[in-house]
Amino acid sequence: MRVRYQVAGMTSILLVIAIGLLWSTRTVNAAADGKITGTVKLDGSAPHMKGIDMSKDPFCVKQHENSPAHLENVIAGPGGGLQNVVLYISEGLSGAEAGQVPSQEPVFDQKNCMYTPHVLAMDVNQKFKVATSDQTTHNIHPLPNALAGNIPWNKSQPPGAPPIETSWKTEEVAIPVKCNIHPWMHGYFVVVKGPYAITDEKGSYTIENVPPGSYTVTAWQEEYGTQTAKVTVAAGKPGTADFTFKAK
């Protein structure tokens, strides 16, 4: 009889622990269900993006026979929405929240002798891949600030080469990327801590998995620099932060 009571008691304890863990998990998930949404626009006319001379490589020329390539420093839609702007939480996250590293691996592709996407954002220590879809050799060369803790590197990727898998150790907004073979190829890696987003072709964005709280959101654009905005996220109610950059 004593053994039966001990087993029953142990079962009850385990059940209580399991319920507690389930409740804790639900609480954490609920806390991270918030989001910050908004738009980023350009006030004024977008600068003309120059065409790119790819005559150095016949393969590259052929990829753009019907659609000439242009620089992508500033891409604005008909309504002024700015594409490729990175939004991230620069103040307000706890250490644990800022230290969470996403499991998904974003991909930076070399396609049609351009970087796709032009700007790739990622978390500190988040693994990402550099791939090549082209039938010509590229040499990718990120140029971080070594004093900030990230180490520059450059690697050749011939046709069919496997993706390069790597990560960055510290925050840096932003790391220029170039190709040593094709001088017109340039892009950026933006390395942050915590949730982030990149604007689409309409200038819209959504930062997911934001716990309730008050934050500073920073918007970064390669030509226009940064802007910040204060935003509050409540349980079940997204925060909103809109930005407008003045055209040069």
Task: Please state what every model-predicted region is.
Residues 14-16, 177:
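Intrinsically disordered, low-complexity regions enriched in Ser/Pro/Gly/Gln/His and often acidic
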